Amino acid sequence: NAMRYGITEGLFKFNDSMEVEPWLAESYTVNDEHTEWVITLKDGIKFSDGCDLTPTKVKEYFEYLKEMGPSGSAKPQKYLEFEATVTADDEANTLTIQTTQPYANLPGQLAHPTMGIVDVADTENFDNGTIGTGPYMIDTFNGVGVGYDLVANPNYREEVPYDEVKLMYMGDASAKTMALQS
């Protein structure tokens, strides 16, 4: 999941004081019962493949999570009520989430790193090229348990600190120590 920080981003994020703030979202409103959330997306956000981030893309990702069901170690499905209804309005640039019960902390739930938005148009190639809006994108998948080579996302809206990042997985504590010392 640490990889998600560089490849994907969420509608919300935790700031340095651990307060939730909009990230891919520009703003949001919530009804008094905390059962209907209308989230307005920021304009001009692009996925690493150049496609625009739209409310429909976000809705498709949430639907994909429901379809996949709880699996893997991250289980992003647990951060959005399974029965929630998600409606996308691309013209208004809004996403409406209706829950069956009050959900006072929905922005906090959507700020969790596993809720980074992914373009699910091509789910066959997730390992080799997850499409996100983050500062980096996958250049090379080096194999399970080996890692990834990341490159700067040319469609990112800000400068990134590095042109390339190598993520290496090391299960052995001694190997980690030796790698850090070299």
What are these regions (language model features)?
Residues 1-30, 131-132:
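N-terminal lobe/hinge region of extracytoplasmic solute-binding protein
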Residues 12, 16, 46, 63-70, ...:
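Sec-exported extracytoplasmic/periplasmic mature domains
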Residues 26-71, 179:
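Aromatic- and charge-enriched surface segment that lines or borders ligand/interaction sites
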Residues 29, 40, 74-119:
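Surface-exposed binding/hinge segments that line
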Residues 36-39, 58-61, 95-97, 134-139, ...:
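Short, well-ordered beta-strand elements
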